[in-house]
Amino acid sequence: VDKYDDYLVVQFHTQGIEKWKKEIVEALVSVVKPKGIYERSDVMKKKREGGVIGGVGAYCHTPSQLDEERANINSPLHGKIPDKIKITENGHKFWVDVIHGQKTGFFLDQRDKRQALAKYVEGKKVLNCFSYTGGFSVYALNAGAEKVVSVDASREALEMAEENVKLNKLDEKKAEFILADVKEYLRDQTSGAYDVIILDPPAFIKDRHKINEGLSGYKKINEAALRILPPGGILVSASCSAHLSLDDFRFMLSESAGRAGRTLQILETYTHGVDHPELVAFMEGEYLKCCFALVS
């Protein structure tokens, strides 16, 4: 459950919790008293469980049928939801599209990492990769970055990132938005082009059978970023893959640094925020990890 202003967005990831949807929604309405509740659940996760959605006896496989299923579960559960919701996070303002955006519309679990970024970017050239709607970019500009370049493969996300820069009345001349594949963009940059690089990609490891494939993806983007950063540069690298442990993530960073001919010193390590408690019997809940590292 994510709360945006007076609205809630919920995701039901498993068939087990799906059975309690009615009771959960009723409890949220009673306790939180939101103006609206919107559901953004992941069809594919339930499909892997062989579950049932919207009374359909089996999952469909054609694109049109899948789109229809998504419409069945991505819908209002209570009240009305506006097209965009304006939120304030640590004094920064953002537009959130809970209907069409990724996941629930915004990545609230990264807010402490965005806050931590501020002390590293004053007067620096910052590259925000997989920038989405510009969360890290807004924080960097507000903290005095000389220039912030946001790179993402989604035109819609970049357009909202630009709106968020304007919403915070930041210097638009210091912000650049580039529609590109991050891996290709990193490959084309020269050493020293940026002082701080943020890597906040989508999950490269979707399930336990693709760990090696996903690790290869993480290594490639981190190695490419490290080749660009000069000595004294800062790498902010994150992973939201539940199947990748923090120890393995740090080892991946070490390997990437070696391949790039760099040395990394971990300055700070973060997981998800205090509102994402972890069950000791459900280690998959430890999905997010993020390291701030000094390059030499």
Positions of the model-derived regions?
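Non-catalytic substrate-recognition/targeting regions of SAM-dependent transferases
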Residues: D2, W20-F106
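Conserved class I S-adenosyl-L-methionine
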Residues: E122-Y132
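Conserved SAM-binding motif I beta-strand of class I
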Residues: K147-D152
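S-adenosyl-L-methionine
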Residues: E156-I198
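C-terminal catalytic and target-recognition region of SAM-dependent MTase-like enzymes
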Residues: A193, I234-S296
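Mobile active-site "lid"/loop adjacent to the S-adenosyl-L-methionine
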Residues: D195-A224
